[in-house]
Amino acid sequence: FMTAVNAEGVEIHVARLHNTIEARDLKLFVHHPSNLEGSTNNNSIVLHLAHGNIDFLFTGDAEKEAEGQMLILSSVRLPEVEILKVGHHGSRTALSEDFLAITSPEVAIYMAGTDNSYGHPHQETIDALTQIDAMIYGTDVNGTITITSNGETYSVSTQN
């Protein structure tokens, strides 16, 4: 990857807290990390994509520690979202009650391999998402998951 980037002379930008990229009706906000310390998972870049009236939150491998940092930073205003990419493959180490209460996703997507050795997603995570009536999709069950949006509505389609 870096060989191709260097060959093309592409300028590299490191994502930083509060960075914003705008293009037409799309806005991309960086919500995390505020600094790089602790575990690699908790240094995951957390991105909020606003497409018109539809909001997505991509949490990478962020765990409860990173969620807590975002919740206590007054400069980070986590949005209520339609679509949440669940942190850390649906592990019990991610998705705190406070984080869920604020983001309140309609759709939650986790990424995990079938019969993975970590047992992802963990039942506690599925239960928490079920309690808020989120529609739950996972790559282990649904295969490829595609979200299509026109900025006013969205639809979910799956491979399986």
Where are these regions (language model features)?
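Non-globular, low-confidence helical/coil segments that flank catalytic cores
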Residues: F1-N160
